[in-house]
Amino acid sequence: LHTAKLELYIWTGVYADRAATDKRYTLTKEEIGGNNFVTYELSKLIRDYMITEYNNYSTDSLWVDAVVEIRDSNNAIVQVGGLNTTTSTYLAIDGYGYFEDGANPRSTEYTTPMLLQNNTTVYYSDGQDIRIPVYAEAATVTATLSPTVTDIDVKWNLADIFWQAGSNTWNGGNSNLSVIDSGNSDQKIQYLIIIGTQDLVDNSTLTLSSNNSSYSTNTVITLTKVCEPKYTPLSIIFYNKYGALQNMWFFKKSTTDINITSEKFKNNMIDFDNSGGTPSYALTKHQEKKFVANGKESITINSGFYDESFNEVVRQMLLSEQVWIYDGSSTLPINLKSNTLQFKKSVNDKLISYTISFEYAFDKINNII
């Protein structure tokens, strides 16, 4: 090996949809020091095409073909398996592993769990929708609610996007749902959405089972209702380590602060025109004038009591590069303001709650257009 040329194709839809226009990068590298190999970092290139505009569209997964051509020191093609090029195909999802997990803990389809979140207890605000990410690539997944509820009370369905609005035409909660992947990249991550939760029995369970032997153990999720009569519950939405959108409710007190920035200059206050030619000035005029004023608001929120397993959920929230806050009527982008957090343990703290500060990801005065 002397040089290796990489042609990287990235696209959405079904795998067969790949076109010549989907070639996003062509890169050539030479071996160094007779190592007889070269290395390409694909993930950073692919991430450029992972795009989310909340309430509009999202690209949670992509098809990727890495086509490699090898040449020797005479610039002649080195065939591999009788072929001039070799193609490696990937389904790319914008997740991550921890250092202690080793290299790429999601290297095969069956190492990705059916439930694309770590917590198997979901605390939800009474009457608000429940949204749970499910992996649909590896096998057909069946979702079952227990105890059963009449279809006029609770509805549920699957959606390709997290923010899909509910509908009264959806399946009743007394019927099972099948999570099926048709091969489209948009359906690899699906969201199980439950509406009408005011009629859902507290601590109902949602069971995910699969027809694939690689998922021999069912996943049981407990749905715990929280009724908060005093404060307005806030939902924090974020991308978790599996590359799926997830939300966590903060039920208790929240406070909002604003930080103002501006420039100042000394104003010329002398007035000849309105004082009969005698130099004068108005006492109501600003000698020190402020301009280019704007503000950034921040919010500090409190979760209420959670079980210790939510330490991992909060960790992923704090590590997320895209976070939003939902107050029951609108969704706005936010960035983490608290850069440190002490994780709590029930053996030490008895009751576990979280207080986190975020900054709204925009200036208060619109200066875009």
Language model regions located:
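Extracellular/virion structural assembly segments
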Residues: 158, 199, 213-369
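Preference for solvent-exposed, low-hydrophobicity sequence contexts
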Residues: 1-227
